């Protein structure tokens, strides 16, 4: 894992697949090699956009100086000089903004070029989008209808599109202050920093011990506050703010409230009645078999501020490829059942971790520090599938010995574990200033994040137990 983060060739060459926003899929690599062969004279790196507007957005914000652009029938090709600063910037942009081609889209293109045939069998479904929206709207609560839901190519694309639209709204209102409440997911932090630049200021309240400052900030800055961005609960420490209080403060000062309940799912964390916009990564829970990237944006009809963004957001998002929607439509009928089962398994796993002598700390939705805030919204026994923890012994020995899939994702039928801080914030782990920020946020570099799958709880506990014996 460290070799991957340090981009050691001997590690990267063995990495055949990975989370699509971090590791380029083999189908996209094959397509890239095909187009590079058409231009052998130029040592370029090739990028693909399913939505040409995403290239316009990237060009505008990154100020890329050298690029050769080719418009194909249903996608855009951008050639950038390899190993250039522009190339590195665009790679980061793809990760943080959640754009590009899906592997199924690339495979369809390769099939049309006669390079390879489509190997996957997906049930054709002209109503796939409607099927997905129907189930996702119900998960958010009775106040949400399918018409209130937009589907996007990824969860990151959902947030990026909403925040872009919110910045336009804030500029019109002459508001220049945003608050990140709780430690947010890496790409949410990065895309906010990238988009804000010099036109706005961001205040970070990373730890629950700082949440009380939010009222002071509103009292001090009042009408200058454009909005609050929070996860409910947060990633990876599963902290939850007092969302009712935050809603009241936003209403008093006409501020936008953007909430992402992905960690526990919108089915568990019913945040819609308190939010102006709800972001959700359908890659988790809905895609419980782990082979589709997708996101959603929900606009609660009670929120005039949220509804005012809907048209702009709909023009900014990149819609999922039709085969990805068909694949998601095959899985999503089991969404409710998957969440119910993993809720119950999670309760057993948390009890096991809390009672184990080699476990130092456990972080989950109902933890003592902020659990009451989560319970006020979700009720009891709905923790979602994610729990984070620290071990008392050797973190390295435990992780290396753990007989479980290692992945940065969650919400799949197979249990997953990852050393979250190393994966998401490696630059911080390797710098003194970064370590100070992590420490202030209560994030141990040796934090482990576990996603509980559909295996029997005893099987999951056995895997953990064997590794804990060796740490």
Region roles according to the model:
Residues 1-157, 165-168, 181-195, 201, ...:
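Conserved N-terminal alpha-helix of the aminotransferase class I/II PLP-enzyme fold
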Residues 6, 19-22, 26, 277-429:
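Active-site C-terminal subdomain of aminotransferase-like
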Residues 148-358:
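Conserved PLP-enzyme active-site core in the AAT-like
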Residues 375, 435-439:
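Short beta-strand/turn micro-motifs at beta-sheet edges
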Residues 379-382, 441-445:
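A structural signal for short secondary-structure junctions
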Residues 450:
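Pyridoxal 5′-phosphate
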Residues 463-471:
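C-terminal alpha-helix
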């Amino acid at each position: 894992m460290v070799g991957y983060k340090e981009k050691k060739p001997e590690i990267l060459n063995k990495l055949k697949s990975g989370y699509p926003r971090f590791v380029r899929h083999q189908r996209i690599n094959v397509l890239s090699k095909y187009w590079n062969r058409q231009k052998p004279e130029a040592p370029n790196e090739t990028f693909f956009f399913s939505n040409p507007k995403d290239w316009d957005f990237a060009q505008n914000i990154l100020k890329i100086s050298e690029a050769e652009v080719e418009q194909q029938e249903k996608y855009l090709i951008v050639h950038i000089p390899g190993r250039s600063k522009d190339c590195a910037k665009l790679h980061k942009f793809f990760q943080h903004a959640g754009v590009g081609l899906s592997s199924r889209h690339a495979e369809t293109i390769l099939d049309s070029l006669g390079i390879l045939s489509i190997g996957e069998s997906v049930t054709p479904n002209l109503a796939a989008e409607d099927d997905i929206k129907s189930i996702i709207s119900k998960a958010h609560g009775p106040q949400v209808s399918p018409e209130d839901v937009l589907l996007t190519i990824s969860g990151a694309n959902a947030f990026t599109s909403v925040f872009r639209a919110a910045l336009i709204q804030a500029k019109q209102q002459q508001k220049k202050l945003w608050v990140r409440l709780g430690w947010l997911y890496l790409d949410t932090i990065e895309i906010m920093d990238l988009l804000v630049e010099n036109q706005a200021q961001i205040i970070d309240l990373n730890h629950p011990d700082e949440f009380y400052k939010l009222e002071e900030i509103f009292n001090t800055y009042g009408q200058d506050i454009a909005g609050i961005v929070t996860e409910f609960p947060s990633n990876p420490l599963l902290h939850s703010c007092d969302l009712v209080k935050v809603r009241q403060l936003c209403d008093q000062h006409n501020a936008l409230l953007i909430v992402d309940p992905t960690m526990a799912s919108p089915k568990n964390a019913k945040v819609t009645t308190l939010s102006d916009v709800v972001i959700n990564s359908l890659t988790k829970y809905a895609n419980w078999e782990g082979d589709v990237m997708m996101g959603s944006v929900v606009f609660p009809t009670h929120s005039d501020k949220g509804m005012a963004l809907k048209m702009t957001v709909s023009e900014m998002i990149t819609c999922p490829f039709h085969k990805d929607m068909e694949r998601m439509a095959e899985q999503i009928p089991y969404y409710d059942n998957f969440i119910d089962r993993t809720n119950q398994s999670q309760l057993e796993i948390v009890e096991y971790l809390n009672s184990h002598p080699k476990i130092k700390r456990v972080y989950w939705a109902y933890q003592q520090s902020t659990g009451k805030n989560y319970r006020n919204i979700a009720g009891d026994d709905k923790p979602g599938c994610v729990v984070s923890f620290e071990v008392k012994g050797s973190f390295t020995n435990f992780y290396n010995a753990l007989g479980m899939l290692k992945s940065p994702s969650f919400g799949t039928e197979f249990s997953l574990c990852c050393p979250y801080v190393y994966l998401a914030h490696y630059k911080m782990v390797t710098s003194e200033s970064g370590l100070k920020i992590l420490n202030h946020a209560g994030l141990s570099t040796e934090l482990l994040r576990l996603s509980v799958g559909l295996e029997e709880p005893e099987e999951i506990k056995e895997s953990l137990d064997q590794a804990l014996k060796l740490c």
